[in-house]
């Protein structure tokens, strides 16, 4: 019998096994990192062969279940990241997943049903391969020894890597060991979750750190500062910036009271990094979570302000996330479950407290986070049809505008000011199932271009700057802008809003979802353009 005939006979008998190996290999080569591919493939094949030789069906299924589910989940995550963002999964995505609350995860899963189907298909495929006991395959002893050799070699290599890391950093990290070992297994993406868990522990260790600042405090004539952080807001969908639909009538009605930033850009296209960049001393080029304690809340506290953090983004995992490490420093924190308007009663209560004391009140909105159709009450919809994604997104913008109008109404008779900006923008591609989505690798300008303005109460008169700023200004410098806005600065910082803007305008460096730094100006304007700025075939017409 020729080699070809032997192979054909083997393929006919074990075609599901061959198919699963091919699917596993191609998926990991295309949508995941190719690192340690030989070890991962051997681990996958040998595990299947070992399990198939377990004679007891209940025991075989018990052993197979975690392997099958983890492998299918890992591959589905890789496919999601590659197909949606054009990049492999990484620790930044893992951090975002770990910092998402269950409600948000459930909503997002509903949007990405193809990847749930991929998970189900892969699980069934691998289970179909494993479920049949097959005596024609090599014995458990042979495959078990080979699998043990692969695991031992991988563990030894991971230990070597962790030892070198510990030697360089003078500290051993079990997360580094776990992360490295995962790269040799079919569960490659677990390495990113191990790194995210390491970041979580680092955040826990520094969250309670309160630095002492040498502060310069000046009287701005303002007693109440309301900082509103929007979520996933596109400038291109706001009539304030020229959009054809009237999505921002309340803000436009206040145009004479507003200092508008026409070219504000976010430092990153996802919340877990963009918000800390905006509210702390962290920076695009020198990202380090040890910068997080140097934040606007700690500065305001030391300056004698009463501080509040009111959020409609779930309190799930309140400790150990980037945003909550800042929020927890506020004197009062409130998390509501529901639509953004539920924050308004808490804002009213905060305004009534200690009326003689200066206040910084932060409202962290759910805004236009995907899925936008769930971001507002259906009774608030003004654009139809309500199941159209563009209408839903525009309704979410209109809903936020309505909330801003109510905030202005609460503050119009006070010596108050409101700063509003969005954490990041969103991409738009009408050819995709989910038209709006976060920026990924080498995101377009739309993922970064955000709305930003400062509203001043009419009570403050004409002594404040309401001119329009047309230069690029990165929200990565908003901590300095907010400090100057409050009149609470460090000696080495620009002291006034004008000084901050003059000093940092034009700095257009941004980081993408792959942690690579780009010049915003050089990015394609829209997602549907290629990297040279030409419309793609799908984006034409």
UniProtKB/Swiss-Prot annotation:
Q: Which residues lie on this side of the membrane: Periplasmic?
A: 1-60, 132-141, 286-541
Q: Does the keyword Lipoprotein apply?
A: no
Swiss-Prot/TrEMBL keywords = Cell inner membrane, Cell membrane, Membrane, Transferase, Transmembrane, Transmembrane helix
Its biological purpose:
There are several lipid A forms in this strain, including a phosphoethanolamine (1-O-P-pEtN) form; overexpression of this gene does not lead to higher levels of the 1-O-P-pEtN form of lipid A.
- Recorded GO MF terms: phosphotransferase activity, phosphate group as acceptor
On the Cytoplasmic side, which residues? 82-110, 163-264
Question: Which top EC class applies here?
Answer: transferase
**S-S bonds:** none
Enzyme Commission code: 2.-.-.-
GO BP terms: namely: lipopolysaccharide core region biosynthetic process
Superkingdom per UniProt: Bacteria
What's the gene? yhbX
Q: Does the keyword Nucleotide-binding apply?
A: no
Instruction: Name any GO cellular component annotation.
Output: plasma membrane
The way it spans or sits in the membrane comes to: Multi-pass membrane protein
PANTHER family in UniProt = INNER MEMBRANE PROTEIN (PTHR30443), PHOSPHOETHANOLAMINE TRANSFERASE OPGE-RELATED (PTHR30443:SF4)
Q: Which family does this protein fall into? A: Belongs to the phosphoethanolamine transferase family.
Q: Which Pfam families match?
A: Sulfatase (PF00884)
- What is the name attached to this protein's record? Putative transferase YhbX
Where in the cell is the protein located? Cell inner membrane
Q: List all membrane-crossing ranges.
A: 61-81, 111-131, 142-162, 265-285
């Amino acid at each position: 019998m020729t080699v070809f005939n032997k192979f054909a006979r083997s393929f006919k008998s074990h075609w599901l096994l061959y198919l699963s190996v091919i699917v596993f290999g191609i998926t990991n080569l295309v949508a995941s990192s190719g690192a340690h591919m030989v070890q991962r493939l051997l681990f996958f094949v040998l595990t299947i062969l070992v399990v198939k030789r377990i004679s007891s069906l209940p025991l075989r299924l018990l052993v197979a279940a975690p392997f099958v589910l983890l492998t299918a989940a890992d591959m589905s995550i890789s496919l999601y990241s590659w197909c949606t963002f054009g990049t492999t999964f990484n620790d930044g995505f893992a951090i975002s997943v770990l910092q998402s609350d269950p409600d948000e995860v459930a909503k997002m899963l509903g949007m990405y049903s193809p990847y749930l189907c991929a998970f189900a298909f892969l699980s069934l495929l691998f289970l179909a391969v494993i479920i049949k006991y097959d005596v024609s395959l090599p014995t458990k002893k042979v495959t078990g020894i080979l699998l043990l050799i692969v695991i031992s070699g991988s563990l030894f290599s991971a230990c070597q890597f962790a030892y070198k890391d510990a030697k360089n950093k003078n500290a051993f990290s079990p997360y580094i060991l776990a992360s490295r070992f995962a790269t040799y297994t079919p569960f490659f993406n677990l390495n990113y979750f191990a790194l995210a868990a390491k970041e979580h522990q680092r955040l826990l260790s520094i969250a309670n750190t309160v630095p002492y600042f040498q502060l310069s405090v000046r009287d701005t004539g303002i007693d109440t500062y309301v900082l509103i952080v929007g979520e996933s807001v596109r400038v291109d969908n706001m009539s304030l910036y020229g959009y054809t639909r009237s999505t921002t009538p309340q803000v436009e009605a206040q145009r004479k009271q507003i200092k508008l930033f026409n070219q504000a850009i976010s430092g990153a296209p996802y919340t877990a990094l963009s918000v800390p960049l905006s509210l702390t001393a962290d920076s695009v080029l020198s990202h380090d979570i040890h910068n997080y304690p140097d934040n606007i809340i700690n500065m305001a506290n030391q300056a004698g302000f009463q501080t509040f953090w009111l959020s409609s983004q779930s309190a799930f995992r309140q400790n150990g996330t980037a945003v909550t490490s800042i929020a927890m420093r506020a004197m009062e924190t409130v998390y509501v479950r529901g639509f953004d308007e539920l924050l308004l009663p808490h804002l009213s209560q905060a305004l009534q407290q200690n009326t003689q004391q200066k206040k910084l009140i932060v409202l962290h909105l759910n805004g236009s986070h995907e899925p936008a159709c769930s971001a507002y009450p259906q009774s608030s919809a003004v654009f139809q049809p309500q199941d159209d994604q563009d209408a839903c997104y525009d309704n979410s913008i209109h809903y936020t505008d309505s909330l801003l109008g109510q905030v202005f109404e609460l503050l119009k008779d006070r010596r108050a000011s409101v700063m509003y900006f969005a954490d990041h923008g969103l991409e738009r591609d009408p050819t995709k199932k989910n038209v709006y989505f976060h920026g990924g690798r080498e995101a377009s300008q739309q993922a970064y271009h955000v709305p930003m303005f400062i509203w001043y109460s009419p009570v403050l008169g004409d002594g404040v700057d309401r001119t329009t700023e047309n230069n690029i200004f990165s929200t990565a410098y908003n901590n300095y802008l907010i400090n100057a806005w409050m009149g609470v600065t460090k000696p080495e910082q620009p002291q006034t809003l004008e000084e901050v803007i003059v000093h940092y305008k034009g700095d257009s460096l941004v980081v993408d979802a792959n942690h690579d730094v780009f010049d915003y100006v050089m990015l394609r304007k829209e997602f549907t353009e290629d990297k040279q700025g030409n419309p793609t075939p799908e984006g034409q017409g």
